[in-house]
C-alpha cells in the first residue's frame, strides 16, 4: 500500500487506530506519547497524566537505508514509567524491544485508552508472489505526518476512578472508526483482501488460544478467598505471609497490578474473618516480620477443589431454569406461547414478568374443572440458558391450592367403615348426621343372629359397641331446660360373628316398634347437684355406667333405657357395686347438716356457687358422714347400757 504525497509515492507500512483517530505509519520509527514544551511526538494521546511524554516507540527492524528499504519485523520499545499492555501482557519500562505480531492492541495502564496496531507491509518474497493491489490516490492536502487529539474529547479517554470499569484489551480486534463524519484527521485507505484475511485469521487464532488466560488483564472470575487459596496451595511450604499473597496475585493476574489498592483490603478482611484461614506466628529463628497464613487442614481438600471454579458473572441468575425450547439463543417461541415470552426474552421468568404477560392458549382442559381446589395460573416452557446445551420441552405447571371458605362447614360424618361379610348383602356406609355435638356412638347391624344380649330397632337386630361410648361433656344450662341431642340412624351394613369380637357388650330388649330417631335427653345439673346421681328401683341402688360397664352383665330379658349426664342403667335386676360406690351414692342422696357460726352472728352469708366436685371429694365427705354416724350410734349404745 502506498500514499501519493506531492507527486511522490510514500509506502504505508502499518496503521495505528484509536477511538477517534487513525494514523498511517510511513517511516521506520514512530513515537507515541503526549505533547509538551519539551517537544512533540508523532502520535499524541492527549493530556492524561498516566501517559508519559515519550511513552512508546514503534520501529522497523531490517537492513537498508531510506524509506524504500526492505521492511522487516516491527518492534516496540517502552519508554514510559507506567509501562504498557500488549495483548494483555505487561511490558515494563526498559525491557528489551518486543517483537510485535501482525495485529495487536496496546493499552495504557489505569486507563481505557487503546491503540490497535496493524502491520500492512509484507516481505519482499511475498510481494513478488502476491499480485499488486490497486492504488487509489487521495488528496495531497490531507496527508499530515503528525496528528493531535483535540482537547474537547479528552474527557472520553480520561482514566476511570474505579478499577471495575477497566476494559480488557485481550482478544480485541481492529475496530471500525467511529464518527466517520466528525473526525477531521481521518485518512482514506485501501486494505488488500489478503491482509483482511490475515487479520481475521490472527483473531481466530487468539480466540482459540483462550482469552481468559492468567496473563489476561481482565478481572479474574475468582473470589478473594479463592485467590488466597490458590496462593497458599502453590507455596512450597503451604504457607505465605500477607505480602507473599499480594505478590502471587499480582504475578498471576495482571489486573491487580494497576487496579485500585482496595482489593488488598479485601484480602486482609478475608484472612481475618474466614475461619478456613489460620494465622501461624513466625518463629524467632525465621528472618523477616509478619505472620504466616495457612489453610485449615480439615477443609484443605475441599477448598483446593473449589479454588479454580469460576464464578458466574454478575447479572446472571444463580439458578438454572428447566429445559425447554424458549430462550434468547434458541428457536422462536411457538404461537401458543407468543403472549408469554417476547422476542427479546432472556429465558428467565420472574413472577412479575408472568403477571405482566398474557396467559398462553391452553392445550388441555381446564384443570380447575377436574379438581376444584387447584387453580392453574401459568404454563410455560423454559430453556437452558447455557449455549450449546441440548434442548428439551418439559412443561412447568404452576398451581395454587385454594382454601375452603370459613363459612362452609361439613355436616356429615362417617362413623362406621363398611364391613365385608359372607352374606350376599352389599356393604353400605353408615352415616350419622350430627345436629349438636354428641359423644361418638357406633351402631352396627347384626343379621341372622338372635343371641342373648341383642336388641331390635325398627325390625333390625342391633348391637351397640359399649367400648365406643364415652361420657359426654357436661354443659350447664342456666335456665334449667333440657337439651336434646338427635341422632339420625341410616342404613348400616350386616356383619357376622367374626365382626362381633370388637363389641364389648350385647344388650337384648323386647322393643320391636319401628324407630327412626333416637332422642338422648341431657339432664342439666342444678346449683348444688353433683355429677353422680342415685337412681333406685325396687329398693336396689344403681351405679353409673362408667362403673357398671366394667363388670359382666348377666341379666337377660330386661328393659333398659339410655340416659345422659350421667349415663346409667336402670332395671329390676341385681347389680354388683363396691361399698365405696354405695357410700358415695348414699352420701349424695342424704341432706347436708346446717352449721352455725362460732361468733354467734345471726347474719348468714349467701351461698356461693360451688364447682364440680370430683369423686375423691365425694368419697371424703362420705367417709366423714359415716364416721360421725358411727360415733353417735356408739354413744347412744353406751348411754343405754348405763
Curated annotation (Swiss-Prot):
Residues 327-353, 589-605 have a biased composition (Polar residues). GO terms for biological process: canonical glycolysis; intracellular glucose homeostasis; negative regulation of autophagy; negative regulation of DNA-templated transcription; positive regulation of DNA-templated transcription; regulation of DNA-templated transcription; regulation of glucose metabolic process; regulation of transcription by RNA polymerase II. Residues 203-219, 606-615 have a biased composition (Basic and acidic residues). CDD domains: FH_FOXK2 (cd20055), FHA_FOXK2 (cd22723). Its main location: nucleus. Residues 261-279, 289-293, 309-314 are annotated as: DNA-binding. Mg(2+) binds at residues 271-272, 274, 277. Residues 30-91 form the FHA domain. Pfam families: FHA, Forkhead. Keywords: Activator, Cytoplasm, DNA-binding, Magnesium, Metal-binding, Nucleus, Repressor, Transcription, Transcription regulation. Residues 219-314 bind DNA. Residues 201-221, 323-359, 589-615 are annotated as: Disordered. One of its GO terms (molecular function) is transcription cis-regulatory region binding. GO terms for cellular component: cytoplasm; nucleus. It is found in: Nucleus; Cytoplasm. In neurula embryos, expressed strongly in the future floor plate and weakly in the neural crest progenitor cells. As development progresses, expression becomes stronger in neural crest cells. At stage 24, expressed in the eye, brain, branchial arches and in the presomitic mesoderm in the posterior embryo. At stage 29, additionally expressed in the pronephric tubules. At stage 35, expressed in the migrating lateral muscle precursors of the abdomen. Additionally, the developing proctodeum and head structures including the branchial arches, eyes and otic vesicles continue to show expression. Transcriptional regulator involved in different processes such as glucose metabolism, aerobic glycolysis and autophagy. Recognizes and binds the forkhead DNA sequence motif (5'-GTAAACA-3') and can both act as a transcription activator or repressor, depending on the context. Acts as a key regulator of metabolic reprogramming towards aerobic glycolysis, a process in which glucose is converted to lactate in the presence of oxygen. The C-terminal part of the DNA-binding domain may contribute to DNA recognition specificity. This is Forkhead box protein K2. The lineage of its organism: Eukaryota, Metazoa, Chordata, Craniata, Vertebrata.
Amino acid at each position: 500500500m502506498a500514499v501519493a504525497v506531492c507527486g511522490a509515492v510514500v509506502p504505508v507500512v502499518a496503521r495505528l487506530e484509536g477511538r477517534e483517530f487513525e494514523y498511517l505509519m510511513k517511516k521506520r520509527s514512530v513515537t507515541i506519547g503526549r505533547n509538551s514544551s519539551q517537544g512533540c511526538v508523532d502520535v499524541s494521546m492527549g493530556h492524561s497524566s498516566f501517559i508519559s511524554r515519550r511513552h512508546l516507540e514503534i520501529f522497523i527492524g531490517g537492513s537498508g537505508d531510506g524509506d524504500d528499504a526492505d521492511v522487516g519485523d516491527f518492534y516496540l520499545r517502552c519508554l514510559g514509567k507506567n509501562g504498557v499492555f500488549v495483548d494483555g501482557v505487561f511490558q515494563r519500562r526498559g525491557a528489551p524491544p518486543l517483537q510485535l505480531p501482525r495485529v495487536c492492541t496496546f493499552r495504557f495502564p489505569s486507563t481505557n485508552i487503546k491503540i490497535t496496531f496493524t502491520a500492512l507491509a509484507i516481505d519482499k518474497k511475498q510481494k513478488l508472489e502476491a499480485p499488486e493491489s490497486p492504488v487509489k490516490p487521495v488528496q495531497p492536502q490531507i496527508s499530515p505526518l503528525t496528528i493531535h487529539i483535540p482537547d474537547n474529547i479528552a474527557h472520553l479517554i480520561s482514566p476511570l476512578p474505579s478499577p471495575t470499569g477497566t476494559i480488557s484489551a485481550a482478544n480485541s480486534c481492529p475496530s471500525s472508526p467511529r464518527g466517520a463524519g466528525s473526525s477531521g484527521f481521518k485518512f482514506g485507505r485501501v486494505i488488500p483482501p489478503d491482509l483482511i484475511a490475515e487479520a481475521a485469521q490472527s483473531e481466530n487464532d487468539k480466540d482459540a488460544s483462550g482469552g481468559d488466560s492468567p496473563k489476561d488483564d481482565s478481572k479474574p472470575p475468582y473470589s478473594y478467598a479463592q485467590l488466597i487459596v490458590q496462593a497458599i496451595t502453590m507455596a512450597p511450604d503451604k504457607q505465605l505471609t500477607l505480602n507473599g499473597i499480594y505478590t502471587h496475585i499480582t504475578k498471576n493476574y495482571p489486573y491487580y497490578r494497576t487496579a485500585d489498592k482496595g482489593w488488598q483490603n479485601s484480602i486482609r478482611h478475608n484472612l481475618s474473618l474466614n475461619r478456613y484461614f489460620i494465622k501461624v506466628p513466625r518463629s524467632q529463628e525465621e528472618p523477616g516480620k509478619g505472620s504466616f497464613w495457612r489453610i485449615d487442614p480439615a477443609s484443605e481438600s475441599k477448598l483446593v477443589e473449589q479454588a479454580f471454579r469460576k464464578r458466574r458473572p454478575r447479572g446472571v441468575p444463580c439458578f438454572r431454569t428447566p429445559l425447554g425450547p424458549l430462550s434468547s439463543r434458541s428457536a422462536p417461541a411457538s404461537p401458543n406461547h407468543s403472549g408469554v415470552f417476547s422476542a427479546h426474552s432472556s429465558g428467565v421468568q420472574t413472577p412479575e414478568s408472568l403477571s405482566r404477560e398474557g396467559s398462553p392458549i391452553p392445550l388441555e382442559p381446564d384443570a380447575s374443572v377436574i379438581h376444584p381446589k387447584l387453580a392453574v395460573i401459568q404454563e410455560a416452557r423454559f430453556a437452558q440458558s447455557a449455549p450449546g446445551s441440548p434442548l428439551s420441552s418439559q412443561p412447568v405447571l404452576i398451581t395454587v391450592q385454594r382454601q375452603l371458605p370459613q363459612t362452609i362447614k361439613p355436616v356429615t360424618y362417617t362413623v362406621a367403615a363398611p364391613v365385608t361379610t359372607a352374606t350376599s348383602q352389599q356393604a353400605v356406609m353408615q352415616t350419622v348426621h350430627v345436629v349438636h355435638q354428641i359423644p361418638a356412638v357406633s351402631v352396627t347391624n347384626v343379621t341372622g343372629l338372635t343371641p342373648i344380649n341383642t336388641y331390635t330397632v325398627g325390625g333390625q337386630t342391633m348391637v351397640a359397641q359399649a367400648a365406643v361410648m364415652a361420657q359426654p361433656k357436661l354443659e350447664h344450662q342456666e335456665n334449667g331446660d333440657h337439651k336434646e341431642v338427635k341422632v339420625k340412624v341410616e342404613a348400616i351394613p350386616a356383619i357376622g360373628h367374626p365382626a362381633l369380637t370388637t363389641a364389648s357388650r350385647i344388650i337384648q330388649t323386647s322393643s320391636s316398634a319401628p324407630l327412626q330417631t333416637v332422642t338422648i335427653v341431657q339432664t342439666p345439673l342444678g346449683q348444688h347437684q353433683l355429677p353422680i346421681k342415685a337412681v333406685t328401683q325396687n329398693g336396689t341402688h344403681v351405679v353409673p355406667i362408667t362403673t357398671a360397664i366394667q363388670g359382666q352383665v348377666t341379666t337377660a330379658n330386661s328393659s333398659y333405657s339410655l340416659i345422659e349426664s350421667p349415663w346409667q342403667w336402670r332395671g329390676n335386676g341385681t347389680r354388683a357395686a363396691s361399698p365405696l360406690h354405695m357410700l358415695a351414692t348414699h352420701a349424695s342422696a342424704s341432706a347436708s347438716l346446717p352449721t352455725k357460726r362460732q361468733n354467734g352472728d345471726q347474719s348468714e352469708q349467701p351461698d356461693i356457687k360451688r364447682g364440680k366436685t370430683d369423686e375423691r371429694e365425694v368419697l371424703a365427705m362420705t367417709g366423714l358422714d359415716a364416721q360421725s354416724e358411727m360415733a353417735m350410734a356408739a354413744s347412744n349404745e353406751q348411754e343405754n347400757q348405763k
